[in-house]
Swiss-Prot record:
It comes from Staphylococcus aureus (strain bovine RF122 / ET3-1). One of its GO terms (biological process) is cytolysis in another organism. It comes from the Bacteria. This is Uncharacterized leukocidin-like protein 2. InterPro entries: Bi-component_toxin_staph (IPR003963), Leukocidin/Hemolysin_toxin (IPR016183), Leukocidin/porin_MspA_sf (IPR036435). Keywords: Signal. Residues 1-27 form the signal peptide. The keyword Glycosyltransferase does not apply. Belongs to the aerolysin family.
Length: 351
């Protein structure tokens, strides 16, 4: 009987120890969860604060202490959309107020979209009646209008770039010093940086044209285009060609490879990101800039049905452009649109 009593007492003690251990574990777990929750709330609040700061930074026109000591950045944005050409210009103007430099400084980032305007057309009056119009070239042009006191000192991108993705960073340091590098990142903790990043699959970016201190031009030109299992050069008249007996003049799309196979810049369009760095003599109060976005189109002409007639390629046959003039007030650090026009049948031609 005594042994049975001892067993019961031991069993009760074991249960008590287990319960106490479980309670301790639960308490520790609850405490840890509480700590984690507090930590999470702290992180969330910190992130929300950072988010608010970013939002406020975007909303505010002036952000102090971005350029060394007492430097300021004033940001402006202008957006112009033209329905006729289906082209959108979105320009960011960053005024850099640097007390250690004797000139005004401005970074202009040219963004927006140039829609592809891909079209399949029927032209019954021609033997090669089925047409495909596709964007073979995209152009962005920036120039200072009749003002020698404002100069272009640098640009991104430079030269020729053939990679599918283009990434570059421009950095400005106090005293008018600037630098640009490939990739995304800052070169100095005391500098103000601006990045560009865009996709150009199967196209090449070339900084060409009248590039000088008042004019810069970028061309994004089709190269070897891949669609499905095919790869053909932009100069090949068999590009996107499909010889099928079911193609008719009423269904021109059937004379060409399925459009969902086309590269993104052919199928959808191009989203530019180009940067210009300018300086201005402080005696000059206002400067006008003319910005032109252009879409060049090649036309591929196929004959429907069974035949032996070769397709026809006409390069840069069509084009649409949007030209906008912006005026910068250097003293008040403001920008406004003073003129805008667009037109068809105006492909960009160098020279």
């Amino acid at each position: 009987m005594k042994n049975k009593k001892r067993v019961l007492i031991a069993s009760s003690l074991s249960c008590a120890i287990l319960l106490l251990s479980a309670a301790t574990t639960q308490a520790n777990s609850a405490h840890k969860d509480s700590q984690d929750q507090n930590k999470k709330e702290h992180v969330d609040k910190s992130q929300q604060k950072d988010k608010r700061n970013v939002t406020n930074k975007d909303k505010n026109s002036t952000v102090p202490d971005d350029i060394g000591k007492n430097g300021k950045i004033t940001k402006r944005t202008e957006t112009v959309y033209d329905e006729k050409t289906n082209i959108l210009q979105n320009l960011q103007f960053d005024f850099i107020d640097d007390p250690t430099y004797d000139k005004n400084v401005l970074l202009v980032k040219k963004q927006g979209s140039i829609h592809s305007n891909l079209k399949f057309e029927s032209h019954k009056e021609e033997k090669n009646s089925n047409w495909l119009k596709y964007p073979s070239e995209y152009h962005v042009d920036f120039q200072v209008k009749r003002n020698r006191k404002t100069e272009i000192l640098d640009q991104l991108p430079k030269n020729k770039i053939s990679t599918a993705k283009v990434d570059s960073t421009f950095s400005y340091s106090s005293g008018g010093k600037f630098d640009s590098t490939k990739g995304i990142g800052r070169t100095s903790s005391n500098s103000y940086s601006k990045t560009i990043s865009y996709n150009q699959q199967k196209y090449d970016t070339i900084a060409i044209g009248k590039n000088n201190n008042w004019h810069v031009h970028w061309s994004v030109i089709a190269n070897d285009l891949k669609y499905g299992g095919e790869v053909k050069n932009r100069n090949d008249e068999l590009l996107f060609y499909r010889n099928t007996r079911i193609a008719t003049v009423e269904n021109p799309e059937l004379s060409f490879a399925s459009k969902y196979r086309y590269p993104a810049l052919v199928r959808s369009g191009f989203n530019p990101e180009f940067l210009t760095y300018l300086s201005n003599e402080k005696s000059n109060e206002k400067t006008q800039f003319e910005v032109t976005y252009t879409r060049n189109q090649d036309i591929l002409k196929n004959r429907p049905g069974i035949h032996y007639a070769p397709p026809i390629l006409e390069k840069n046959k069509d084009g649409q452009r949007l030209i906008v003039t912006y005026e910068v007030d250097w003293k008040n650090k403001t920008v406004k649109v003073v003129d805008k026009y667009s037109d068809d049948n105006k492909p960009y031609k160098e020279g």
